[in-house]
Amino acid sequence: MTAGVTRFATAITRLPCKNAVDGLRAVDQGVPSIDQMLADHADYCAVLASAGANVITLPALPAFPDAHFVEDTALCLPEGVIFMSPGAPSRFGEVAAMRTDIAHLFSETHQIFPPAHIEGGDILITGTEILVGTSDRTNAAGVEALTRIAANWGYHVRTVNTPPGVLHFKTDCSLLDDGVVLSTQRLASSGCFSGFKIGYHCFFTFAKINGQKKVFCFGCP
């Protein structure tokens, strides 16, 4: 397992397409603004670049409204890339496009195929293991396929349960650094983060990016 999993040299992003407003939704909160999405995406890329990352921005895919969620279709590791097998039928075609766009960046490539299904939003890579939450988008066969590939690179994969009603495992958690996880109480109470410091509470701060005021949320252990 590579140390320093929270430190990255390169970030891969994809521009939201105009059809992104028609993307899948776990909860219907109204029609999003594509102009706001594009502005937020630009700010996101700017922050990554300011932190020293080489930001690769892939072109929008009009046929796939959810394609800007790039982590769901490709798990990028120092040893290579594993192309995922999305659990939502409308996202199947994203994988081929992602493979065309980024496969050349990696020395080794693998792909998971149906009936195994797994999405990157259910995968949390820590400094000691890879946690995968089963969900409506990730099944046991998908976890098994990932486990076989990752084992060849020295990674241990552990399966955990995503709480009912939660789209992805990482909807309820995120890695703050190699030893600290920001999590909801309902997920942390399952015991899946044993051995980690857990942040439950949040505070907010404001910063200006490109002259606009933005709000940021941080977790406190």
Residue ranges and their predicted role:
Residues 1-221:
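The feature marks the mature, well-folded catalytic cores of soluble enzymes
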